[in-house]
Each structure stands twice: as C-alpha cells, then as structure tokens.
Amino acid sequence: MQHHYADINGIRMHYVTHGAGEPIIFLHGFPEYWGAWKKELNDLGKDHYVIAPDLRGYNLTSRPQKVEDYHIKHLVEDVRALMQHLGLKKSSIVCQDWGALLGWSFLLRHPDLVTRFVTINITHPALFDRELRENPRQQLAAQYMLVFASPQAEPQLMGDDFAWAKQAVINDARAHGAILSEDDVAEWVASWRQPGAITAGLNYYRAAKMGPPDGEGHPGGSNLLEGLKPDQYVVHTPVLFIHGEQDTYLLADGQRGLKELVPNLTIRRLPDATHWVALEKPREVSQFVREFLRGQG
C-alpha cells in the first residue's frame, strides 16, 4: 500500500492507495482510522483502485481546533476535494459508522459523483434522525451520543490508556471473530494517541448536534440534512446495505422505509456480526462489495 498526503479544503489529509482499476473510496468511523479497512483494501485492491483516507482530525490527517470545523459541510467537501485531487470524476464509496453518515451526506449532495454506494449498518440520515427523535429503543441505545457530546467524553474515552476504546472496539471485535495481531492493535492505539485525535472524532458528534432528546430542549436527531430539500432525500444510485444483526448501537428499526427512499437497494445480512463488521467479517464484506460492484448483488 502507498501512503500519500493531499492539501485540500484547508487541511492536510493522509490517505492510502492500493491496486488499479475502478475506484473505491473507503470512509472509516469513530474511533477508527484508515486501517479499519486493511483487509478489505488488500482483497479489493486485487482488481480495484482502493483509496482509504484518515478523515479530518483522525490519525495522520490534520486537526482543525474548532467544533464547527467538523460540520458536515466541511466533511463532505473533504471527500469532494480528495476526489478532485485524485482526478476522479466518479467513484464507488464503502463506508461504516461516522464514515457512513458522511458517505450518505456526500451521496445526497453529490449523487453525480458516486457510482455505487455501500453502507454498513448506517441507514439513510432521514431515517436515522427519525429513530433518534421517535424510537425509545434507539434513543436508549444512543445514550452514548450524549456522553460523546459532553465535556466528560475525553477523560472517559482516554482514561487508563484508552481502556474504553480498547474494550469497545478491539476486545469486542475480537470476541466476534476479528483477527487482530498485536501489531494491528499497536497501530490502532497509536492513532488514538495522536494529540487531539480523540477530541477531533468527538467533535463530529458535537458539530452534528447528534443524539437522542437530551432533556434540555434538544428534540433528537442531527443536522446532517441541513440545506437539503425533502425531494433530495430520494437516492437513485445503487445502494448496498450490509447489516451486522448484532449491532447494539444501531438498531434494525432504522431500516423501516429505506426501500422507499432508496429504490435501487440491496441488503445483505450477517446474523452474528456486531457494529464492527469490517473487522469481524472482512472476507464477507469484500465478497459482498465485489459482487455488488459487478452488478451481481
């Protein structure tokens, strides 16, 4: 794999490329970095040109200091500017967790730039907001978002040498089949130890005003759809939704109504996968993506 930097949209973005062929951009989540996709990049890079950035604020990409610097409009522009830097007129996108919220937001604003779209566990933002506003089960599952938005988040996540992140990501994924070497774990921890990286990741939640009702006037939802009209919510791009059915953060209720907003929809389910599907089931993810991009799934 080759490592690169691009000076785009006011930041210096680190990204990795591999292979040749039709492009696929991979967008990671929180608290991740480009290496969350390492196995998929190695596999799909055999017959595609794969690109995996460290998103704004993460790992080796620069970190603006203000919360508002992580507003969705800036994140979307980062992806568009990276494509321009790479000379890509269109690309498929594969994304998970916060990367999928960004991916959907990019797709809704720039449908002409996306060939095919793969989201893991994250539903359409309109349905995501509905669930946060109206569904008590999802509201309970999303209480962590209120913690992430609070000043207490950094000490909780960074305390005892990132014990929370190690348990929530590494240990949980390993318990569900992820094969992560000690070198892999060291790379993850090194990404968290980058000064300001955890705060930058938390600022995604803060800038998006994302979460369930907070009891202090926030009705729940997010600002991810800001500036869009309802008629822009319908997606005509082919979409693959990969669902890890044991995800306790993002409930399946959010899929209700997805077919109406995404007529060209394919769903593939992994009954024993959790939130960390790309780590737990890289072979299956690569297979699903390859078949979908070939028009077979």
Regions found by a protein language model. Name each.
Residues 4-8:
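Short acidic-hydrophobic surface loop/beta-edge motif
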Residues 263-297:
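Catalytic active-site module of serine/aspartate enzymes centered on a nucleophile-bearing elbow/loop
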Residues 29, 71, 280-281:
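Active-site helix-initiating loop/hinge in glycosyltransferases
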Residues 26, 52, 241-243, 269:
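Hydrophobic beta-strand core positions in alpha/beta domains
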Residues 37-38, 251-255, 279-283:
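Conserved strand-to-helix beginnings and helix N-cap segments that scaffold or border functional pockets
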Residues 1, 11-13, 23, 58-94, ...:
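Flexible "cap/lid" subdomain of the alpha/beta-hydrolase fold that forms the substrate-access gate
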Residues 16-63, 82:
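Conserved HGGG/HGGXW glycine-rich cap/lid loop of the alpha/beta-hydrolase fold
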Residues 20, 245-247, 272-274:
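Acidic beta-to-alpha connecting loop that harbors the catalytic carboxylate
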